[in-house]
Amino acid sequence: MPNRASKSTRRAALSIALILASTAPAAMAQGYADAVALLTPLPLATTDAKAVDARCTDLLTGIGKARAALEARTGRATMAADFTAYDALQMTISDGGGEMYTVSQTNSDAAVRTAAETCYQKISDLSTQIGLSRPIYNRLSAIPTRGLDKASAFTLAKMLTTYRLAGVDKDDATRAQITQLQKEITETGVQFGANIRDDKGDMTLKPEELAGMPQDWLDAHKPAADGFVHLTYDYPDVVPVFEFASIRATRQKVLTGFSNRAWPKNQAVLKTLLEKRYALARLLGYTDYAQLVTADKMIGSPERAAGFLDDANVAAKPGAEADYAELLAFAKTVDPSIERLETWDNSYMKNLLRKQKYAVDAAEVRQYFTYDKARAGIFKLMGDLFGADIRPWDTPVWDKSVTAWELYDGQRLIGRFYLDMHPRAGKYNHAAQFPIRTGVEGQQIPVGALICNFPATGAMDHRDVETFLHEFGHLIH
């Protein structure tokens, strides 16, 4: 979930199932039973907003019952019973939210996406309330630390610190303000992302402005009836332009349009988000939001973070300056009018320099990669590296272009995943791994999805293949 308390809580809690499995497997199994039952349905392919609302009611009811049960616990507190119940509650929040977020970012029906976004916000709001629950905090605080192994003791301490950073020790009025601010931060963040997702763009270019583009790209981008080539902000439309368009003004036009997605709409949204984050930090006793979000991180403070970046800059600058000088000198041989390299020059000039210096032609490299070949190669790599056997998974999907797969270790099923890899209207327009179900040994198989935007047909840029492999690494992890 996007609010700070629950996100940090979930990260630290992910390891607890393995910790508890070695100490009290029976108690752990019972503790997760209700959560697993609630999360067993996987209605990602819904076409009905009312069905999303009904599913949301089930999730919120289940989360509410688990919360009430944990808050009402009495007697001796233990890791095996109480922390398992807490972790199961967090898993329900995380997985329920992941389910709704996936629907909100992938469904082709705007009403379904809106219903899922609304539910995601409701789950996030409930997560904030749980992150400020004094009864839960008091129950976790009552778990004896004596005799705990090192990992369990660390995890428990991390949870309690997260609660305190979230404001659990504040008075009722302050906690109510925190809850409201977290709600507004979530809503604003969702709106910011939705504005980018929904701005598909329509950049018009004359065919002659697209000199240098690979033939397979030109074949897929024919002029419309008005004589212009129309480009969206989808990666398969714009990224090859940055790399291959020989006319500098074309690269500038496309990169400027792409970089200004959701502007000016998001200008006010971002301002609101920054203001709300600052207000939250001040309410919690911090100087600013940067101080708040680094308080429980390894870096420790904004000052140390800035120092780390300064040190990295000092170390990297000589090499970067040498690379820039070489690329600028080369660029002037291509276009003598260039006095300095702009962002829209980098990919194009690097491609030309690699071609001259190393005989590596990016346009030729493209011809070796299509999506199907890249997918087959990555699946084979997983088999060669890990002995993984990836098989088709017969399950409903939310679009005809989506494929579903199961991951086996020998004959043992260890994971499931979806590949939603090509652009379409209303879909998330970047590349990411979406967690949908958390693995619980013996009870729940982990499920994830790759949501990307690669060309459905024709050639892929090598950088697309790198992105595919990068995101698939997250999925396997």
Say what each PLM segment does.
Residues 13-24:
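Bacterial N-terminal signal peptides
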